[in-house]
Amino acid sequence: MDPYLLLKAIGFFLLVIIGIPGNMFIIIQFVLVKIIEKKLLPTNIILTMLATANLLVIFSRIIFQLLNAIGLEDLLDESECKFMIFTYRVSRAMSIGITSLLSCHQCILLAPSTKVWSYLKQKVSQNAMTIIIILCVLLISMYSYTILISHARKNTTSSPYTLHLIYCDADFVTYTSYTVNGTFYLLRDLILVTLMILSSIYIVYTLLQHERNVRGIRSSDRGQKSSAEYKASRAVILLVALYVILFGLDNSMWVYMLTLSYVNPNMNEIRVFLTSSYASLSPILIIITNPKLKNKLKYSYAKKTLPKNATNNGLVFSISKSDNKDTIR
């Protein structure tokens, strides 16, 4: 097997085995919280929908990249190609949009309690799911054109303005439609990334102010609530940083490719890997920075391993909860 194909297969395989269990774990745990506690915090609603969008990205793009890397060809027919490309476009845009919404929501939560900010806090928190639904409907309508331009790969000659997407082609036919599409993608990403960065800058500034003002009072109820909010803020900053890094690498390669008279197909594969990585890597950050998910994962691991240890070593273990954290005695 060609070393490059082997490396590509390993890379996309790792994204699949990390991304699917990670996103599924987030979705299942928050659904259980909703069923048991009858409510779900707005931030957790946003995280659930982000994990759902990430999962769709994996199923509509990363898995097919893996199958192509191991040598499987001609898997999709015409209608399946249209569905796959449409799903990928919408879900990837949803992933970016929801991450931007998450950073803006956290920024609003940390804003001063003025009349305007208090109104925004109330409305955004109460209507987080509605905002996501509106975003989804908007993106579905915006990307409906992909159904018309997407086709199963054929042996016939296509136009020079065709994107070759694994088993499918997206033929824009004219230079104008090709450049308009590329410009739209770039502007969309720039706007959302700018919102993420501005929100994160404000969050970082607020965190620094918080560190100076609340030292020594974390034991109070207000301090505990504030501490939870700022821990959530750090998680948002990490997610934004991850996306901005991947976005920067992807677009740096894209700008470089524009300067070349001939673009090696392998470079486009690397760009696909970078743009898809967020869907698989972001669940790791969400789980390790969310206390509820992190404690549940620890408890599940302890529950699975303790009986075996008890049998082998003749020891008795018990799991108890103290201060809302799982501990092993």
What are the roles of these predicted feature ranges?
Residues 1-329:
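Transmembrane helical core of 7TM receptor-like proteins
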